[in-house]
């Protein structure tokens, strides 16, 4: 079988820095996933949108929620919310996208290295240690880059580290199925290093909070 390996060259890391213009929702197809219609919305899989002003008895399942776009077409997109059997209509609904800024000069990335906790269920009748897996810890995400204090993405990283606020991030691989990872994280540290006849380097450590969505 030929290799299906993905080249890392061309990968992009982005950080949320605001919001874009709201797009009008003209249709809602309940189910799992939920499919929404919005003419020429311009979203990409992995984008993040916040819903408002949808109507129907179960509109609260979407209104006010910030969700990851998946399975997009020119005029529709889906979100991973199970609305099977629910009543949600377009009304004057909108989807407002989160605006992301690319972090430039990245040399390498690593992470998504978490693991589930172990729950010890051994008792006096056990003949060997017994365990269940608990909640999954999504781990960390680290980027190594050449420092540029004028780069808007690097500025946003530093600002997030100072504020301690949670931020949305995207890792966009250059190819492959579901190439975009979207996640929330806290920038724990942004460090700099240098030496004789060297480029000034920077490293950012991001603690992931919650699930990672590939789309």
Task: Set out the residue ranges of the language-model regions.
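Small/polar beta-strand repeat architecture
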Residues: 2-8, 15-47, 52-124
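Intrinsic-disorder/low-complexity, polar/charged segments enriched in Ser/Thr/Lys/Arg/Asp/Glu/Gln
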Residues: 33, 138-142, 166-168, 182, ...
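Short structured motifs
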Residues: 126-130, 189-191
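Oligomerization/assembly interface segments of phage tail-like spikes and tubes
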Residues: 130-149, 198-212
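Short, acidic/charged, Gly/Pro-enriched secondary-structure junctions
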Residues: 153-184
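Short beta-strand and beta-hairpin "edge-sheet" elements
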Residues: 172-215
């Amino acid at each position: 079988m030929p290799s299906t390996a993905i080249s890392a060259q061309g990968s992009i890391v982005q950080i949320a820095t605001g919001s874009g213009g709201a797009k009008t929702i003209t249709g809602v197809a309940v189910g799992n996933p939920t499919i929404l219609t919005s003419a020429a919305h311009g979203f990409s899989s992995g984008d993040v949108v916040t819903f408002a002003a949808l109507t129907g008895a179960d509109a609260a399942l979407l209104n006010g929620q910030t969700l990851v776009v998946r399975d997009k077409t020119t005029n529709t997109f889906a979100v991973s919310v199970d609305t099977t059997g629910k009543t949600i209509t377009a009304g004057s609904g909108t989807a407002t996208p989160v605006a992301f800024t690319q972090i430039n000069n990245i040399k390498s990335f690593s992470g998504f290295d978490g693991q589930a906790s172990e729950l010890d269920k051994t008792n006096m009748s056990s003949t060997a240690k017994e365990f269940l897996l608990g909640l999954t810890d999504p781990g960390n995400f680290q980027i190594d880059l050449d420092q540029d204090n004028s780069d808007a993405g690097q500025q946003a990283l530093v600002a997030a580290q100072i504020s301690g606020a949670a931020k949305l991030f995207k890792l966009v691989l250059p190819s492959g199925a579901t190439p975009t990872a979207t996640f929330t994280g806290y920038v724990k540290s942004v460090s700099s290093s240098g030496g004789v006849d060297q480029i000034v380097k920077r490293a950012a450590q991001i603690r992931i909070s919650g699930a990672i969505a590939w789309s």
